[in-house]
């Protein structure tokens, strides 16, 4: 299940950049399609993450923190794409997104079921 989770968030990250770029270039139809596919991947990420949490968490704070950071990351991804679609500024959101994404990945790598890089 870990591989499904990692694959889904990698694909979601790619889709965020594609949707963002398509909205920026004015290709609304293609952007809408990729945005809907991105939303499907949000659901997959949340479901696989919840399954990993229930299976391996032992109900400690690190796993709960990782889950919370993951949900915040998904929220920021969606906010980036929506604000670009509406033509609003996204500078601050990009900074917040990158910080939260890095924290989420680092915490995920630190946890026992992650890849043991650290």
UniProtKB/Swiss-Prot annotation:
Localization in the cell: Cell membrane
Lineage: Bacteria, Bacillati, Bacillota, Bacilli, Bacillales
Keyword annotations: Cell membrane, Membrane, Transmembrane, Transmembrane helix
Any single Gene Ontology cellular-component annotation: plasma membrane
Database matches in HAMAP family: UPF0344
Membership in a protein family: Belongs to the UPF0344 family.
Membrane association type: Multi-pass membrane protein
Domain of life, source organism: Bacteria
Originating organism: Bacillus velezensis (strain DSM 23117 / BGSC 10A6 / LMG 26770 / FZB42) (Bacillus amyloliquefaciens subsp. plantarum)
InterPro entries, sorted: UPF0344
Membrane-spanning ranges: 4-24, 33-53, 62-82, 93-113
Nuclease found in the keyword field: no
Protein name: UPF0344 protein RBAM_010920
Record carries keyword Iron: no
Predominant location category: membrane
């Amino acid at each position: 299940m870990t591989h499904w989770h990692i694959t889904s968030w990698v694909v979601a990250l790619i889709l965020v950049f594609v949707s963002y770029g398509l909205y920026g270039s004015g290709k609304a139809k293609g952007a809408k399609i990729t945005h809907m596919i991105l939303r499907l991947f949000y659901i997959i990420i949340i479901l696989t993450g919840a399954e990993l949490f229930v299976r391996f968490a032992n109900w400690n704070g690190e796993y709960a923190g990782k889950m919370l950071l993951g949900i915040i990351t998904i929220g920021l991804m969606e906010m980036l794409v929506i604000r670009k679609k509406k033509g609003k500024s996204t500078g601050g959101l990009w900074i917040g997104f990158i910080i939260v994404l890095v924290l989420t990945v680092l915490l995920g790598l630190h946890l026992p079921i992650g890849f043991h890089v650290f």
